[in-house]
Amino acid sequence: MPKEKTHINIVVIGHVDSGKSTTTGHLIYKCGGIDQRTIEKFEKESAEMGKGSFKYAWVLDNLKAERERGITIDISLWKFETSKYYFTIIDAPGHRDFIKNMITGTSQADVAILIVAAGTGEFEAGISKNGQTREHILLSYTLGVKQMIVGVNKMDAIQYKQERYEEIKKEISAFLKKTGYNPDKIPFVPISGFQGDNMIEPSTNMPWYKGPTLIGALDSVTPPERPVDKPLRLPLQDVYKISGIGTVPVGRVETGILKPGTIVQFAPSGVSSECKSIEMHHTALAQAIPGDNVGFNVRNLTVKDIKRGNVASDAKNQPAVGCEDFTAQVIVMNHPGQIRKGYTPVLDCHTSHIACKFEELLSKIDRRTGKSMEGGEPEYIKNGDSALVKIVPTKPLCVEEFAKFPPLGRFAVRDMKQTVAVGVVKAVTPRAANASAAGKKK
């Protein structure tokens, strides 16, 4: 048996018309899980609708439409492979909940592909103050996406000019550096997602470019380390009652290892029970590791005791607990007015969805250095501001420090049906043990 290829999760970011769908569609089309029949169907429909030239974006638009209509489509369609890795596109902007998904996303992106359009005016619109390019770069950095590849797209529209490519590279590099990335470690690839230049094969139209193709750049990313050595953390997505088996919580292992026989403690309530068995895709597992989506059977607990948003951990190894309050670095991205103390939006953190109060605005933060700015407590914060905030949940909640457990330490601040801010947890005040252990069961 050949060793299975390493899985890598990608998020595709960039301004609205930069050509993300076309580029992504092209990769899936050429290296991915779409069979010939589906492609022919798409080509035919595309021609019938007068789209004339078959656009790769068509692939993605169809998948997206099916996804949004709630048709569960084969997730393999969002996968493609290279000689080294299996890639899964975990999200692409254009989905209504893109930003929320990126934060609470069941999986952390290992690498971001930033697509920028080279066209005159197009690039400038994307990188302008209200363009999405900056927002997405900032988001990726805040959420701990360490690796990035930049695709300078639509090179065909500017006659493959090197000067324009260099100009864009210079400007994006400056912004990446300001955000905290090291641009020297980021490959910039001039591409045409539509014509196929430098996507998979080196382009004959750009003899001046000596770097890797987009696929080549993807092949040279560093595989992520999966955090098996950390204590167990498994946020629950659902809890099922299955006749003949009992109570089955379901979720994704974020850190650590779950084995049958483990005494599992659930936060924030503190109830605990032995894990009897674990299943993934209807197959029994001897252990579940980070990245595994599993169901596991617990004794003596009902669906009233545990619910979505709870966090399962090992009772004997630094178990998760509920929090009284926590301090977080919050970046305001999309709020129409001023946020003052007392503001109580909904926070989406891992699988939980709970109203939380901004108890105190502690200080503004200089985004370049990450340090608190002079001037003490701000009266309010607004779009573009980064601040240290003390947050109090209105109901029991379990969060962790981002530095220790990243997936449990990132959150989206939701208000008016949109993501108004993002944050990472810096410090947590745990709830007193006796307050939560009253309902303990074995």
UniProtKB/Swiss-Prot annotation:
Residues 5-228 form the tr-type G domain. Keywords: Cytoplasm, Elongation factor, GTP-binding, Nucleotide-binding, Protein biosynthesis. Residues 192-194 are annotated as: G5. Its main location: cytoplasm. Pfam families: GTP-eEF1A_C, GTP_EFTU, GTP_EFTU_D2. Residues 153-156 are annotated as: G4. Residues 70-74 are annotated as: G2. CDD domains: EF1_alpha, EF1_alpha_II, EF1_alpha_III. One of its GO terms (biological process) is translation. It is found in: Cytoplasm. Residues 14-21 are annotated as: G1. It comes from the Eukaryota. Signal peptide: none annotated. Residues 91-94 are annotated as: G3. GO terms for cellular component: cytoplasm. GO terms for molecular function: GTP binding; GTPase activity; translation elongation factor activity. This is Elongation factor 1-alpha. This protein promotes the GTP-dependent binding of aminoacyl-tRNA to the A-site of ribosomes during protein biosynthesis.
